[in-house]
Design a protein with these regions (language model features):
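Alpha-helical segment of the N-proximal tetratricopeptide repeat
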Residues: 21-44, 48
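Register position in tetratricopeptide repeats
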Residues: 31-32, 65-66, 97, 130-134
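Canonical tetratricopeptide repeat
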Residues: 58, 90, 124-128
Length: 134
């Protein structure tokens, strides 16, 4: 009986270690802009922890950057609900890619307002906002 518990514990520990390695690898790929390669790991992580805002952001950005704005949308909305930094920027881009310009404009404006409150540069977001308006 004790052997079963030990095996179960070791298997669980191994799974956590593999998951951590996969996350670290996926984040490294993401940071390098290798979104297609990082996407499967983030997809698995979102399935196991759908409430994790960062996982939703990373997976959503991977989808957006690989030409899947519709798939990205729900994950980016989830990230924004959980107040993940930069989530609004990518959500606005997804709205824009889906021709939902009013929502894109509103989201960019909210993002710019948040940046100003934190005394951060708004230049990139303002350029994207103007692009959505035209």
């Amino acid at each position: 009986m004790n052997k079963k518990y030990i095996l179960f514990f070791l298997f669980g520990l191994l799974s956590i270690t593999i998951s951590a390695q996969s996350l670290a690898e996926a984040k490294a790929l993401y940071e390098k802009g290798e979104y297609e390669e990082a996407k499967p790991t983030f997809k698995k992580l979102v399935k196991t922890q759908p409430g994790n805002g960062n996982y939703n952001l990373w997976y959503g950005v991977c989808c957006l950057e690989t030409g899947e704005p519709a798939e990205a949308l729900k994950h980016l909305e989830s990230a924004v609900k959980r107040r993940v930094p930069s989530g609004q920027l990518y959500l606005a881009r997804a709205y824009n890619d889906l021709y939902r310009f009013e929502e894109a404009i509103e989201t960019y404006e909210t993002y710019i307002s948040d940046l100003r409150k934190r005394k951060r540069s708004t230049e990139e977001a303002e350029q994207l906002l103007e692009k959505s308006k035209s």
